[in-house]
Structures are given as C-alpha cells and as structure tokens.
Amino acid sequence: MKKIKTLCGVLALLCVGMMPVSAQNVLKFNADKKFKIVQFTDVHWVPGDSASEEAAERMNEVLDVEKPDLVIYTGDLVFGKPASEALSKALEPVVSRRLPFAVTWGNHDDEQDMTRIELLEYIKDMPGNLTSTTAGISGVTNYVLPLKSEDGKKDAAVLYVFDSNAYSSLKQVKGYDWIRPDQINWYVESSVGYTERNGGKPLPSLAFFHIPFPEYNEAAQDENALLIGTRKEKACAPLINTGLYAAMLNAGDIMATFVGHTM
C-alpha cells in the first residue's frame, strides 16, 4: 500500500444501533438502539512526520464531532520506527478519551521493529482496548466482538475482525496476502454457532479487515454499481481468492465489510 499523507478517504462512520463498552468490556444495545462506530484506517504513523501530526488532528476532529461508541482501526497504523511510538501516537486520540477500540493489522504494521504479536502485546493493557486473538489459525488479529441486547441477556449482533496478513508467501504468486482457509473456517464455525443459538436465524453482523478481497474490484467494474466517495486506485486485492465473500453470502449474516489498504 502506498504511503498516504492524510486521512482523506479512509474514514467510515457506521451507525448500527448499539452502546459503549461497559467496565467489563461488554458491548450492548442501549435503550434507543443507537450506536456509532468510527473506522480509522491507514494512519501510516511516522514519528516526527508532520503529515502524521495532521492525521492526528483529523482523528481528533472526527472523534469530537461524532462522539463514537467504538473505534475500529483496520490496519497500517505503523509506518516508521520506533513502532511502539508510532502505534501509541496513532491510538492516542482514542486512548486519551478512554473510548472502546479494536485493531487489526495491515501489511505495513510489522515492517519496522516489532512483530504482529509484539504489537498486540504492547496495546494489551491500554484503556478501552478490545483487540484479541484466536489461537490455532493464520494471522494474529482474528477475533469476534459480540454485541448484547439492551438488557444484556442475549447476543444481538456480531462484529468479526480478520487479520488479512501481509504479502504472498508463494513464489509463483506476487502481491498481497489473503485471508486463509483456516480463518474462513473459523468464521463459518463462529457464525454457525451464533445462528444456532439464535434459533436458526443469522445475527446481523459486520466484518473488518485490512486487505480487501477480490470482489471489491469486481463490484467496482460493474456498470450498474453505485460507488459513493472517491476512488483513486483499484482495491489492491490479492491474486488468490479463497472464498471469504462466498462464505459470508452462504452464512447470511454479514451485512457489510469494511477494509483499508486503498485510497
């Protein structure tokens, strides 16, 4: 992903009817069934860079105006050394407000002086952090954020966060990595479990990851597609399609996906 100097075009505001995290880190609907998620992506923080400071100003402006209940960063927070400083600065607008937040890594985050696991460990105890991991599958930042009903008695919606990895490890395949089959199996199994516990009806769900799947480019090429916003480049998707979009369609729960990586 090319270096992005500002946050223009990388912000999504999602209004999906929920409320802030409690002291026990439980997300749930509130009485008026409103909740706001702000998505930040590709902050590309470089310590000492004026463009990074400008990005912080834009994030602060958004948070002050929107007053979100949850913030999700979809990758490429870190773009310079030391990674710990870059990551802290990229998260500071949220952490300073003690807002609930969740993170997934992009292809650039672990290119400096910390691994994905080290980055995850670094933010573990930050106030409001909901980022987690699932052992035994590819990637690091794969986890589920269930959203409870307003009375807290049942699951009412689900947020799926995927680690889309970084670059292809296959010599014959160039470019970016993809969400692996074991990650898709994890999603399907999780989705089936939530559906079964909901009496056979899929729970409304959203998915967040960094590198878009190939269907993003296919959708943009559809002459009947309604594209909102500014599209400065193609989706920079992986060359291999592992079927995540198809799995989501079959599960019937994902209402929308939110990614980063492109302008």
Regions flagged by a language model, labelled:
Residues K34-P47, A156-A166, F208:
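Active-site-proximal beta-strand elements of phosphoester/diester hydrolases
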Residues K67-D69, V158-Y160, V173-T262:
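His/acidic metal-ligating clusters that form di-metal
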Residues V38-A56, L77-E85, E111, I117, ...:
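Acidic/histidine-rich helix-loop elements
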